[in-house]
C-alpha cells in the first residue's frame, strides 16, 4: 500500500506513537512510551539520554530487530522513504522484505563491534558480503569496494586488514570496520548507536567529518545516538532528549544547549566533563554530583593526595610486544605488528597513571601484557618487588587477586549463559574468599556500589544496556579488593551522569583502599579528572609522560597538542577548526620481520615531565 502522501517530501523517516514493552517474570516493563520523531533528508538527529533511557531500544525498533528479543512493539506509524523514493510502512514488512531493506535503505552501526562482527570470517569477506547482496557486485568488485571503504574510514594498511579477523584488530579498528560496512551501500537513513564510543578523539573527529561528508553527498538522514554532548554539539542539527523511556525535550541543537527547559536536560549538560576544568589543580577531583531534581546542586570538593611514597607497586622496564603476521604459500611469518616498543614506567600505590593515545597506539596491548594475557617479547614487569613476566601460570594465579582488569567491551567480558551475580561471585569462589550467603551479600554490596540493584544479580547480560553491563564488569573487578586495577576504557560506554558516578566511585575506593589504577582511555576530559600522571602513547612508544597538570596545561609534544585540539567542545557556538588527518598521516606499525623501530629518547623538561625527541627518520618527526 503506497504511503507517499503520508510523508512530507523532505522527510526520509517518520515515527509516531512508538511504544515498546518487555515481559519479565509475568510483569510488563515499558521501555519506550509514546515516542515520536521525524528525520529530514540530509539532517542529523541526535538522541541523547542516560544508559537505559530507551535510546538503543528505539533504534532497534526502527530496524525491526527488537521483536526477536520478545518485545511488544506498538506504533502509530513508522514510515521510511527508500533510496528509490518509495515510501514503506516498516511495521508492515515481512522478515524477507526487511532483509532487503536493512543495509540498503536503513543501516545501523552498533555500539559493540566485537559482538556485531562474525569472528570466523575476515573483515574483507564481511564487508564484501553486504556489497554483493545489495548492489549485485561480483566478488572481486565487492572486495575492491571494501578496500575503498576501509581507506575512507582512515584504516592504514587497508589491503592487509581485509584478510584479518575481528579479534586481530583493536577496539577502535573494529568500530571503524563496522562504520565502513554500514556506509558501504549508501543507505537513505543511517542509525549510529554510539559509533565513536570506542574511538580516540582524533579518529572520532575524522569519523564525524566522514559521516558528514557522505551525508551531504547522498542526502542521507542520520540518527546519532550518543552520550557525548561534545559530539552532539559538533554533529547534530536537532536533538531529542530521552529520560526513562520518554522523549522529554526536543529542539534545535542551539535551543537544547543554550536554553534547555527540562530539568533532566539541564542535568545532562551540567554533568558534561569540560577539558580545562582542572586547571590550577594538581590532584584528582571528584565530578560534581548533580540530580535532575536539583540541577544546581554541586557537592563540595576535598582534595586528598592518595599516592604512597616509597617503592612503586608496579615497575615496567623496556617492554616490547609484537604480533606475527603470516603470509605466503608456506604460511611463514614475514611481518610483525610492533604493538609496544620499549616502554618504561612506574606506578605507585594509590596513584592513577593514565595511558592515552589513538586507536592502535599500544595502550590496550600494554595493559594485556601486564596481565600476562599476551606474552611480551622482552622487558621486565615487576609487581610489589617480584618479577612476574617470567612466572609460571601456577605461580602467577595468586597474584591475579592483586591485579584486576576492566575491559573495553563489557558484553565480550561476561558469560552470556550465566547470571551477572554468578559472574561477580566467580572470582570469590576461584580464590576461596567466599561461599553461600557471604558471597551473595558481597555481590549485592558490589552491585549497589556501582549504581545497580541487588536483584539485578539474577538477570543475564543481554537484559542490560551497554552502560549497565560495564558497571557489572567494574563490580566484578572490585570483588577481590585488588591493589592494582587496569581499566581499559572502563567508562567509555557510560553516559555522562553515570560516568561521573563511576569515576567518583573509583576515586573513593582509591582513598579507602589505596588502589593504584592504570587508566587506559581516549577521553581526555575524564583523564584530566582522574589522573595523577599521564603517559601519551604513539605507535607503541611513550612520547610524553609527566604529572597530569604539566602535561595538560603545558603539552610539549606535537602529538599531545594534536590530541588536545581534537577534543569536541560541548557548545555548538564554539566550533574549533581541527586538523583532520589524511589516511597517509597515520603511519603503520607493521614492519618486516627483523626490522627494528628506532628507539625514542625521552628528555626531562620539568619536574617528572619527559618528552620524546623527534627522530629524523621516525614517524614522530612528521607531526
UniProtKB/Swiss-Prot annotation:
It is found in: Cell inner membrane. It is an enzyme of class 7 (translocase). ATP binds at residues 49-56, 357-364. The keyword Signal does not apply. PROSITE patterns: ABC_TRANSPORTER_1, ABC_TRANSPORTER_2. GO terms for molecular function: ATP binding; ATP hydrolysis activity. It catalyses: glutathione(out) + ATP + H2O = glutathione(in) + ADP + phosphate + H(+). Keywords: ATP-binding, Cell inner membrane, Cell membrane, Hydrolase, Membrane, Nucleotide-binding, Repeat, Translocase, Transport. GO terms for cellular component: plasma membrane. It is a peripheral membrane protein. The keyword Cell membrane applies. Residues 15-269, 325-564 form the ABC transporter domain. InterPro entries: AAA+_ATPase, ABC_transp_ATP-bind, ABC_transporter-like_ATP-bd, ABC_transporter-like_CS, Oligopep_ABC_C, P-loop_NTPase. Pfam families: ABC_tran, oligo_HPY. Its EC number is 7.4.2.10. Belongs to the ABC transporter superfamily. Glutathione importer (TC 3.A.1.5.11) family. The complex is composed of two ATP-binding proteins (GsiA), two transmembrane proteins (GsiC and GsiD) and a solute-binding protein (GsiB). Part of the ABC transporter complex GsiABCD involved in glutathione import. Responsible for energy coupling to the transport system. This is Glutathione import ATP-binding protein GsiA.
